[in-house]
């Protein structure tokens, strides 16, 4: 599995805003949108393109577009804050949804929504989730996508914990070499606290975007 940490001054600045407990909901959402743009930009750097001839006001030239735009899959509810900006950069992309809630006693994911195409065998997928903590929600999502035939899966996360990275690496190994799994993140933090929150992290990304449940 390929893991790429986006190292850029602008990404670091937006991450600082997300971490800052003084940032209100609006500031948090704005920083998340900006950082999502950077993650998508990095993640699409090597995707296949197809060429075509276009005419400018003065001449013909060669233009390019994505050969096979990805399916965007935000993991609800925190992933909602990433999907609009990802869609803005890839307007031809389709969008699916996976809804997940965390059991605060067991820390295990409780799925409540799956809205995905039945056949993903020829479809690249971008999974959008700001936080990769224990990895439970992401592993569930990866397994769901793999069961539908997805063989090219890219995860975009703002903050990751080593435990979560290990969990998805083990999941990718179970899929075997026929499935490509990549992670793009702005940082890999120190670890998890006793409540399974990322440290230093940025708190609950859903609450900080939309308010408490």
Curated annotation (Swiss-Prot):
Pfam families found in the cross-reference section: UPRTase
Keyword Magnesium: yes
GO molecular function ontology, one term from the record: uracil phosphoribosyltransferase activity
Pathway terms, separated by semicolons: Pyrimidine metabolism; UMP biosynthesis via salvage pathway; UMP from uracil: step 1/1
Catalytic reaction(s) noted: UMP + diphosphate = 5-phospho-alpha-D-ribose 1-diphosphate + uracil
Binding of uracil, residues: 198, 203-205
Record text on activity regulation: Allosterically activated by GTP.
Keywords: Allosteric enzyme, Glycosyltransferase, GTP-binding, Magnesium, Nucleotide-binding, Transferase
Highest taxon above the source species: Bacteria
Gene3D superfamilies, alphabetized: 3.40.50.2020
Binding site for 5-phospho-alpha-D-ribose 1-diphosphate: 77, 102, 129-137, 204
GO biological process, one term: UMP salvage
Cofactor, how bound (note): Binds 1 Mg(2+) ion per subunit. The magnesium is bound as Mg-PRPP.
PANTHER family membership: ADENINE PHOSPHORIBOSYLTRANSFERASE, URACIL PHOSPHORIBOSYLTRANSFERASE, CHLOROPLASTIC
Annotated NCBIfam families: PRK00129.1, upp
Function: Catalyzes the conversion of uracil and 5-phospho-alpha-D-ribose 1-diphosphate (PRPP) to UMP and diphosphate.
Protein name, UniProt field: Uracil phosphoribosyltransferase
Originating organism: Mycobacteroides abscessus (strain ATCC 19977 / DSM 44196 / CCUG 20993 / CIP 104536 / JCM 13569 / NCTC 13031 / TMC 1543 / L948) (Mycobacterium abscessus)
């Amino acid at each position: 599995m390929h893991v790429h940490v986006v190292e850029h001054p602008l990404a670091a600045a937006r991450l600082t805003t997300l971490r800052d407990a003084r940032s209100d909901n609006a500031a948090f959402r704005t920083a998340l949108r900006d950082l999502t743009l950077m993650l998508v930009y990095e993640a699409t750097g090597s995707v296949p393109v197809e060429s075509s001839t276009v005419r400018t006001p003065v001449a013909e030239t060669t233009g390019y577009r994505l050969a096979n735009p990805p399916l965007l899959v935000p993991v609800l509810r925190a992933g909602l804050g990433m999907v609009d900006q990802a869609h803005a950069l890839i307007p031809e992309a389709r969008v699916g949804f996976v809804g997940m809630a965390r059991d605060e006693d067991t820390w295990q994911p409780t799925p409540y929504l799956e809205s995905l195409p039945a056949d993903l065998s020829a479809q690249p997928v971008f999974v959008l989730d700001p936080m990769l903590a224990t990895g439970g929600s992401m592993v569930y999502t990866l397994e769901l996508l793999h069961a539908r035939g997805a063989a090219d899966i890219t995860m975009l996360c703002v903050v990751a914990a080593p435990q979560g990275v290990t969990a998805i690496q083990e999941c990718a190994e179970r899929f075997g070499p026929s499935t490509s799994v990549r992670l793009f993140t702005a940082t890999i933090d120190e670890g998890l606290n006793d409540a399974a929150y990322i440290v230093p992290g940025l708190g609950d990304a859903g609450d900080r975007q939309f308010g408490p449940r």
